[in-house]
């Protein structure tokens, strides 16, 4: 879990930490700066999805007083994600990024427990992953 109030942070030396969902979720610049020639980007939703910011902005308003930095990042999360996808698509056209994304999520959402739907999506992922070998060689 990543959102203050909904989840408890991990505290290290008195500083609360949450998972990376509020950070750079598509760190292409970092990967290339670290020396990668090519990047494989694995998405959990179809590549054409544009992330809406309505829910994030509402929650940001709720947590703003207690967690101002997290609220600021949460309010910008959709914008950052959409910009990252756009950049990934440009780099994919140049042959520098391979985007692996389901064409259909098979009804699977974050808390889905339907084993049949999960297996179907997993199998699609295995098939899609075959493109990685050709890309990195």
Give the label of every model feature segment.
Residues 1-137:
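Patatin-like phospholipase
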